[in-house]
Amino acid sequence: MVENEIAMNVKRFFVAFAALIVTWSVSYADGFRVEWKRTAMDRSRTGVTVASADNVKEAMGEVRCGKYYAPNGKVFRKGVTKKVASVMIGAQPKMADVKQIVAYSTSHMVSHAPESALSDWFIDLLISKCSELTGKRVDVGFANFGGIRVEMPAGDVLLDDILSMFPFKNKLCYLELKGRDIRVILQQMASEGWQVIGGVRCVADKAGNLVSAEIGGEPLDDEKVYGVTTVDFLLDGGDGFHISRNALDVQILDKYVIDVVLPHVKSLTAEGKPIEYQVDGRVKIVK
């Protein structure tokens, strides 16, 4: 009976206890989709915030002598709040690894179409790392907004933040495409919805027509061969894209996205540098 009571009240408890909740999103081949987003929660009942590895007591309170002492000073002697607090606080030592601070971000960055600081930072990093790993020139990058699952917080960035941001087993890829095939991809984005792009500057109208595209400061050349990076999810059907169609070369690298992003943010920290980025107007929508 007690276990059933706890299970039935966990959701209600989180509204009072948690600083935020993360809802997972999964896409299936039949089109069924569950959205994944962060939602700010009311923590007025307990004052709980998200704990890092070294501030569990300050962030979540403590259970002592059969009572739960919440961060806001309230004391709970019984009830589901005390019971779930005991479970959550007791689990924190096992979560210590993902609560490590791995970076510092100068601003809160979100991911949204047609472009955003977080998505620009992400795809430009993939372009740089793909070139480094392959030794080839990479002119253009494509990714999907759905592959960036949560926002970049301002201030301390936890390992958990980065792992939650890029949770999918998407591998980095290198392709060679003619300009005309890149134009087809960009036109699809202009008409169906922009995804993450790098190395290219586009102008589109509100009717969904690609007006112009430049790569390296030059107009997109339909006959020129360009180096392209993307993730394997988008090669043949993911989110409706077939980026490998007509490719002259396709290499699926032995690197997951997280294996590119995480070492990079750790190296920034080791060098005393923060994560910081700004949009640069790579996608412009005109009337």
Which residues make up each language-model segment?
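N-terminal, Lys/Arg- and Ser/Thr-rich interaction peptides
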Residues: 79-105
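Bacterial N-terminal signal peptides that target proteins for export
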Residues: 5-15
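Sec/Tat signal peptide C-region and signal peptidase I cleavage site
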Residues: 25-29
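Feature captures C-terminal
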Residues: 31-73, 116, 120-287
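Bacterial N-terminal signal peptides
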Residues: 16-24
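Acidic/histidine-rich, surface-exposed loop or edge segments in extracytoplasmic proteins
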Residues: 95-113, 241-247
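Membrane-targeting and insertion segments and their boundary/processing signals
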Residues: 92-100, 109, 155-156, 160, ...
